[in-house]
Amino acid sequence: IRRWVNHFGPMIATDWRRPKAHTIWHLDEVYLKIDGRMVYLWRAVDAEGEVLDVLVQAKRDKQAALKLMRKLLKKHGFVPDLLITDNLRSYGAAARDLGIEKHHQRARWRNNRAENSHQPTRRRERKMQGFKSQGSAQRFLSTHAAVYNTFNVQRHFTSASTHRRFRAAAMDTWLTAVAAT
């Protein structure tokens, strides 16, 4: 299964990316322990809970924040109306370097959208008994984000019948993607 995910996962993840992200982005970082050392998982989530991107880096500094922000801006092609982060100063320095500091907002409690998006990763990490390398973590988490976005339906916004329709459509998408590979 792992070889299949490593081979076909990036292709499936690329096909499933949403064309347009919401204009409010939440950025956050959390540590992961890989092979006995601490690395940082940087994650960007939009206001609707869709994971925009993940990045696994060895450091938690301005360069890592810059790399994530540049990657997001290049991928989505626009500057968000609002960029919400926690109080890590690296975000402010990176936003200043990119010239988007007027869109940046530090908010301790408004960043819960990004904080909560780490929970599925923590569950997967426990089930997999950790990640073996930084590269394998990056590959898995990128693919997992695409699959999560496909099946994640904001349940509290929908009725049960609509939720079932969304899940059926997501399953059809999954079966089509798996059959194509």
Predicted feature residues:
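Active-site beta-loop-alpha junctions of metal-dependent nucleic acid enzymes
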Residues: R3-H7, V54-G77
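Mobile genetic element proteins and their domesticated derivatives, centered on retroelements
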Residues: I1, D28, A44, G49, ...
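Short, basic alpha-helical nucleic acid-contact segments in DNA-binding proteins
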Residues: R2-T23
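Short conserved beta-strand segments at catalytic cores or DNA/RNA-binding microdomains
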Residues: D35-V51, D61, M69
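RNase H-like two-metal-ion nuclease catalytic core shared by retroviral integrases
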Residues: A107-R124, K132, A137
